[in-house]
């Protein structure tokens, strides 16, 4: 399974054992990515998920994990999980991204998040996709805005990292926003969002 958008330099696809090797060789550390570091990874955990098939989402699932590929190689991953608001089972898809250090700062993260937003709206029934990031992570906030998500506010003290609770900037896009952006785009170039206005 692969998923991309016309003109995008990245694609999303299922994990392979080779991808596990790449990611195991490039773990998040306090020095390389303090916003994604939550301690040492469990050795072999991703390999076990790939071998069991657990790492391969099916269309329609509101949880999953896919590789981000650019120029034919694994450069990171995207993941998503359901987030319910209230007692009705009508979840939002909350997503995140992790890129290896050599892939950062090249626009791949923004492109991967655009592709993922499109994938989630095209393959699930969610009415909303969202992502949050540390209020100090300015690069990811810009990336989410470029991917078409709108900043909705700050969720105070929601994220435990580096021995303390941190504030998170919350971004989201609803299905009506997404469909309006698609309708406004040309027939030959499909985009997943629009620049957030301030």
Positions of PLM-derived features:
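Conserved hydrophobic/aromatic "anchor" residues
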Residues: 15, 119-121, 149
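A beta-strand edge to alpha-helix "cap/lid" segment located at domain peripheries
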Residues: 122, 127-128
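Conserved acetyl-CoA-binding loop-helix of GNAT-fold acetyltransferases
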Residues: 105-119, 138-146
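GNAT-family acyltransferases
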Residues: 1-102, 165-198
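Positions that flank functional sites
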Residues: 42, 136, 159
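Amphipathic alpha-helical recognition patches that constitute DNA-binding helices
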Residues: 11, 22, 41, 94, ...
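Active-site acidic-Proline motif in GNAT/NAT acetyltransferases
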Residues: 97-102, 106, 122, 135-136
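Conserved catalytic-core motifs of GNAT/GCN5-like acyltransferases
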Residues: 82, 130-132, 150-167
């Amino acid at each position: 399974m692969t998923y991309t958008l016309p003109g995008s330099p990245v694609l999303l696809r299922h994990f392979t054992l080779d991808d596990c090797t790449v990611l195991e060789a490039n773990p998040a550390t306090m020095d390389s990515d303090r916003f994604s570091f939550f301690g040492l990874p469990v050795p072999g955990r991703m390999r076990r998920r790939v071998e069991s098939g657990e790492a391969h989402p099916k269309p329609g699932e509101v949880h999953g994990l896919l590789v981000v590929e650019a120029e034919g190689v694994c450069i990171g991953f995207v993941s998503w999980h359901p987030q319910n608001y209230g007692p009705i089972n009508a979840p939002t898809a909350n997503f995140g991204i992790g890129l290896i250090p050599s892939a950062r700062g090249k626009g791949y993260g923004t492109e991967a998040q655009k592709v993922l937003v499109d994938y989630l709206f095209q393959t699930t029934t969610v009415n909303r996709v969202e992502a949050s990031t540390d209020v100090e992570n300015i690069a990811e906030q810009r990336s989410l805005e470029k991917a078409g998500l709108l900043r909705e506010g700050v969720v105070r003290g929601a994220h435990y990292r580096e021995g303390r609770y941190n504030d998170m900037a919350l971004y989201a896009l609803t299905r009506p926003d997404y469909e309006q952006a698609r309708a406004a785009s040309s027939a030959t170039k499909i985009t997943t969002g629009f620049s957030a206005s301030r």
